[in-house]
Amino acid sequence: MDFQSCLYAIAEELGSEDLAALKFLCLDYIPHKKQETIEDAQKLFLRLREKGMLEEGNLSFLKELLFHISRWDLLVNFLDCNREEMVRELRDPDNAQISPYRVMLFKLSEEVSELELRSFKFLLNNEIPKCKLEDDLSLLEIFVEMEKRTMLAENNLETLKSICDQVNKSLLGKIEDYERSSTERRMSLEGREELPPSVLDEMSLKMAELCDSPREQDSESRTSDKVYQMKNKPRGYCLIINNHDFSKAREDITQLRKMKDRKGTDCDKEALSKTFKELHFEIVSYDDCTANEIHEILEGYQSADHKNKDCFICCILSHGDKGVVYGTDGKEASIYDLTSYFTGSKCPSLSGKPKIFFIQACQGSNFQKGVPDEAGFEQQNHTLEVDSSSHKNYIPDEADFLLGMATVKNCVSYRDPVNGTWYIQSLCQSLRERCPQGDDILSILTGVNYDVSNKDDRRNKGKQMPQPTFTLRKKLFFPP
């Protein structure tokens, strides 16, 4: 297919919502005034060609646009590219042609519900004329109106943050993530600018000598030196140990007579299975395991061949206490012992590869108390349950481990009998949203901390703060 036919075919596949998104992402190249006459994708492509952003043999800008609006089908069908390749490409900020600021605003618009959109309009009533805040006005159009009035800019996010703080705190978290990332990038660039040109030239020469081509250096060296390899499919095993029925524990152990079944845990199991399947892991699940059975399962995967795997994930959903999870028989399994099955000496085929454990269980019986927040937080009216009634090391003292705990030492974690646990549901949602954007796992877990910490147990005035512990040596990404 020739260049013009390719653009025509892509334009024919793009609907009105796609066009609105593309126009917003192109605002830094085509000002709003000049976009008013653009009524279809063909006209947009024509304007981009005039700007030199679309050229035969160079469709990188179009690929980036389609990637951000999630039209991965068009990347595959017309541009011989896929989502995973774009994630790798855009992981290097120097390759991005669309500003992170505009991408952040677009991603925010995708997260806002109809009710939240109405709240945005209400809170802007005094700043933007009512005639501009029409009923069918989208959030992207609201952002444009805010930019016109200098209420919103790359270096002026305070009004937007204030609104998001009132409407949906998770949106505020995304803005703060963007600000942190921008600060890190600016500091990196400033540090580079301080080097004399002669030093930079010498560095560039030495880098070029390390490989046959700059592209190889970008993809291969960066992968081997700074990023864990994630090329195999399946990436590895994802074990899910899902304990629901604790009737045996109640019968056999007097002290555990009040231990409840874990209603809602199947929601977590389903969410984890769906999420990690999308991330190319082989899902293996086990239901209602005793402590001994948990050990036996992990021993089995300790001796498995992980040679053609990049990673190992184990998710344990159960009751727990400080440093332990409970089997359905009420017996304890030490978290440290469970993670230690996968040290380099005990499981050589996983040596140098990331070993990840997500533990949804209480680590004590205390309720974390929250500081009153004027904005408040509405929690659904389901009855919340907890997953049980020294910080010993939970992971071996060697590299390449990550442990995501639902809560900190001595405290409970919360489970909604209808919707699952705060931690696992937030984790899965964040992975599904942010892995396609190229975010690394530690950044994602920081966002999970923010999300979960903003939830409330209104009955006990309790809060929850997840706790990641890790000995990772490199960045860890899960390309979709």
UniProtKB/Swiss-Prot annotation:
Pfam families: DED (PF01335), Peptidase_C14 (PF00656). GO terms for cellular component: cytoplasm; mitochondrion; Noc1p-Noc2p complex; nucleus; plasma membrane; ripoptosome. The modification Phosphotyrosine is found at residue 336. The modification N6-acetyllysine is found at residue 226. Residues 1-218, 377-387 form a propeptide. Keywords: Acetylation, Apoptosis, Cytoplasm, Hydrolase, Nucleus, Phosphoprotein, Protease, Repeat, Thiol protease, Zymogen. CASP8 activity is restricted by RIPK1. (Microbial infection) Inhibited by baculovirus p35 protein P35. It catalyses: Strict requirement for Asp at position P1 and has a preferred cleavage sequence of (Leu/Asp/Val)-Glu-Thr-Asp-|-(Gly/Ser/Ala). It is found in: Cytoplasm; Nucleus. Its main location: cytoplasm. Changing residue 362 to A: Loss of kinase ativity. Knockin mice show embryonic lethality caused by endothelial cell necroptosis leading to cardiovascular defects. GO terms for molecular function: cysteine-type endopeptidase activator activity involved in apoptotic process; cysteine-type endopeptidase activity; endopeptidase activity; peptidase activity. Heterotetramer that consists of two anti-parallel arranged heterodimers, each one formed by a 18 kDa (p18) and a 10 kDa (p10) subunit. Component of the death-induced signaling complex (DISC) composed of cell surface receptor FAS/CD95 or TNFRSF1A, adapter protein FADD and the CASP8 protease; recruitment of CASP8 to the complex is required for processing of CASP8 into the p18 and p10 subunits. Component of the AIM2 PANoptosome complex, a multiprotein complex that drives inflammatory cell death (PANoptosis). Interacts with CFLAR and PEA15. Thiol protease that plays a key role in programmed cell death by acting as a molecular switch for apoptosis, necroptosis and pyroptosis, and is required to prevent tissue damage during embryonic development and adulthood. Initiator protease that induces extrinsic apoptosis by mediating cleavage and activation of effector caspases responsible for FAS/CD95-mediated and TNFRSF1A-induced cell death. Cleaves and activates effector caspases CASP3, CASP4, CASP6, CASP7, CASP9 and CASP10. Binding to the adapter molecule FADD recruits it to either receptor FAS/CD95 or TNFRSF1A. This is Caspase-8.
